[in-house]
């Protein structure tokens, strides 16, 4: 159980890296939404919310990336005029998971360690 959780936490830290890169590029993110198989896991949702320090929303659609691709295709062929319009017409929220304050405090302390270790370990898989 500990090893599985460690893998999930490592992936969550990697996603936080990506989120911070987007924010550094000036991309404004107001909501974090999950879909697909992993979104069904309460543990995964709690880890993500706690690592990010903000709520994550789960969508009713379970198709994951295929759903997003279908929306993009719909915009491409003129079903909707824009991605925001397509999302407004089709995306429905199922649940919101708030960060656990205790977990968030621990992750906030561990994340800088992850940031130092990640590049140090890179030669082993590069």
Question: What do the predicted segments below correspond to?
Answer:
Residues 1-126:
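Glycine/Thr-rich phosphate-binding loops that ligate phosphate moieties of nucleotide
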């Amino acid at each position: 159980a500990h090893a599985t959780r460690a893998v999930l936490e490592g992936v969550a830290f990697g996603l936080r890296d990506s989120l911070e890169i987007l924010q550094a590029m000036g991309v404004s993110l107001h909501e974090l939404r999950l879909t697909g198989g992993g979104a069904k896991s309460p543990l995964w949702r709690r880890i993500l919310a706690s690592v990010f320090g903000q709520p994550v929303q789960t969508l009713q659609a379970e198709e994951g990336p295929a759903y997003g691709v279908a929306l993009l295709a719909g915009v491409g062929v003129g079903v909707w005029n824009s991605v925001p319009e397509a999302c407004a017409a089709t995306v429905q929220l199922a649940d919101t998971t708030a960060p656990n304050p205790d977990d968030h405090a621990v992750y906030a302390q561990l994340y800088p360690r992850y940031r130092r270790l990640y590049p140090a370990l890179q030669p082993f898989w590069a």
